[in-house]
Amino acid sequence: MEAKDHIERRPDRVSIRRLKLVNFRNYAELSLPLGPGHVVLTGENGSGKTNLIEAISFLSPGRGLRRAAYDDVARANAEGGFAIHAALDCMIYGDAEIGTGTAGGGEGGRKVRINRIAASADDLLDYARILWVVPSMDGLFTGGASDRRRFLDRMVLAIDTAHGKRVLDYEKAMRSRNRLLNDGSNDDQWLDAIENQMAELGTAIAAARAQAMRLIAAMIERLPAEGPFPKADCFLEGALESRIGVEAALDLEEDFRRTLRDGRARDRAAGRTLDGPHRTDLIVQHRPKSMPAALCSTGEQKALLIGLILAHARLTAELSGMAPILLLDEIAAHLDMGRRAALFGILDELGGQAFMTGTDRALFDALAGDAQFFNVSAGQLTGI
């Protein structure tokens, strides 16, 4: 999907008007009515602020912003699994009721129901796009490539709803191939079939990533040159991604298929598949300083990450027609007064609903009158 040269109309607001939790982390039971605006959650560390926005992150595909095992999410010493229910106001699809949760005891994955009808997790993207910035992402640019790749794929998923299934199917096929190789199988016909699937999916994954990076780069170019958050230049370091747009997709697919076939002995010895989009890395540079993000200061990395997420949020709103719901955990504490004010202004401009957490309410005073404030203590919320 192509980004327009400008936003022809304001993206539709999607907001949570009521959130209910049962046996989620430290919440035995919660029913929280909400307005359409921003929400600020303050309280001491360990009170449950992040747990609440983690619950909201489960209204999108995946395992939430902590990537936790479902049994770990269910409240300790509670019988059964957990349940999350959200009533959404969505101008595109009308009001929607979303429920998700698990049965507990390791019984299957989580279930999703939309308007009381069983649905897939990917169907959630038809009703809301949810993005987040959390402290665990502070080391994104200096950590392992797998974290950046996961971050990249979540960005792609927000603008290409089929991407998540492609990645899951590719990883499933790759595990099957690894298992066959490790078992010493010489069933070429079976391996050929799996590698055909990997080649097709892998090329599609690389193409989707390259397209997303091109669109994000175009969005960043449209932003003011001297904005409050530094501009990022993003590059993909991957054998397939680097050739997207240069060579025909069918040629790339055939070449990857040949690489997999020729690499069977090497991959069997290594115990894993050594080539493919599962090895791709996202390289980010701080444009004003012409410096790799990994070499920037901690504060510069944080500002760069926030700027990238906000640019992606603009793109997501433009392409989907829905202003994304943003989950911003402990974000204000890392920003000076000028950048906090700029962030709040950008959130208003985006037109979506943002949930922000922090230990110091004073950091959010500029939002007084424009946001709902709650104090969180031991899994209990009190309006302030």
From Swiss-Prot:
One of its GO terms (cellular component) is cytoplasm. It is found in: Cytoplasm. Keywords: ATP-binding, Cytoplasm, DNA damage, DNA repair, DNA replication, DNA-binding, Nucleotide-binding, SOS response. It holds the Pfam family SMC_N. SMART domains: AAA. GO terms for biological process: DNA replication; DNA synthesis involved in DNA repair; double-strand break repair; SOS response. Coiled coil: none annotated. ATP binds at G43, E44, N45, G46, S47, G48, K49, T50. It comes from the Bacteria. The keyword DNA damage applies. Its main location: cytoplasm. GO terms for molecular function: ATP binding; ATP hydrolysis activity; single-stranded DNA binding. The RecF protein is involved in DNA metabolism; it is required for DNA replication and normal SOS inducibility. RecF binds preferentially to single-stranded, linear DNA. It also seems to bind ATP. HAMAP family: RecF (MF_00365). Belongs to the RecF family. This is DNA replication and repair protein RecF. It comes from Brucella abortus (strain 2308). The lineage of its organism: Bacteria, Pseudomonadati, Pseudomonadota, Alphaproteobacteria, Hyphomicrobiales.
